[in-house]
Regions:
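Conserved micro-motifs of the catalytic ATP-binding
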Residues: 51-57, 90-93
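Short helix-loop "hinge" at the ATP-lid/N-box region of the Bergerat-fold HATPase_c
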Residues: 109-113
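Short acidic helix/loop segment immediately C-terminal to the autophosphorylated histidine
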Residues: 14-21
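Short alpha-helical segment of the dimerization/phosphotransfer core of two-component systems
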Residues: 32-37
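Acidic ATP/Mg2+-coordinating residue in the GHKL
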Residues: 138
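Short conserved segment of the HATPase_c
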Residues: 143-157
Length: 208
């Protein structure tokens, strides 16, 4: 577990107080794992909040593209920077949770694109038959077909070493699916290994 590893590195630092390289590496690992635990705690609290009646604070968003732009402007920590395409749909969502969901999906897409030259991410919202359809598409590493049915399970990681190295906790997609479900929507994932992934969430568009 992260705590066991952190304790191990803390013991190593205590055992080698004069070894500057060991101190630097151990401190870096402890910092990284602490960040991962913080992200995990925040995600678990969000999941618990979704279980409470009346947890959603729905507001009318006159332009769903602004939600995508908000995600694009948040500190991402990695590249590529996503491109935004929006038809200006009007939606009623819990703005904070919806942005959290889109940001988690964007961070997942960025992890999938790491080390792949020319990889790209697109955040899109378009109208389809009275629905506002949000998609997060990447041209990253893709998800193996055998893993695809399980990726929204809490703590399930397709590539544990890759996910942990990038700060993942294995709960991001589970949280995204729960946020979508709380809005009466369904999160759907299509992916081809070595080609890329598209995540789709559709909610009713609010018509004038």
């Amino acid at each position: 577990t992260p705590m066991t590893a952190m304790l191990g590195y803390a013991d190593l630092m205590r055992a080698r107080p004069d070894d500057a390289e060991t101190q630097r590496e151990a401190a870096g690992y402890i910092y990284h794992e602490t960040q991962r635990l913080e992200n995990l705690s925040r995600s678990l609290l969000a999941l618990m909040g979704l279980d409470q009646a009346g947890a959603l604070e729905l507001v009318l968003c006159q332009d769903a593209g602004l939600l995508l732009q908000t995600v694009r402007s948040l500190p991402q920590g990695s590249t590529p920077v996503p491109r935004v395409i929006s038809a200006g749909c009007v939606v009623q969502v819990d703005r904070s949770l919806w942005v959290d969901m889109l940001r988690n999906l964007t961070l997942n897409a960025q992890r999938a694109c790491q080390g792949i030259e020319g990889a790209a991410i697109t955040l899109r919202c378009e109208r389809r038959a009275g629905q506002a359809v949000f998609t997060v598409t990447d041209t990253g590493c893709g998800i193996p077909a055998a893993d695809l049915p399980r990726v929204t399970e809490a703590f399930y990681m397709v590539d544990k070493s890759r996910s942990r190295a990038a700060g993942g906790s294995g709960i991001g997609l589970a949280l995204c699916a729960r946020i979508a479900n709380a809005h009466g929507a369904k999160l759907e994932i299509t992916s081809t290994e070595h080609v890329g992934t598209t995540v789709t969430i559709a909610v009713p568009e609010v018509l004038p």
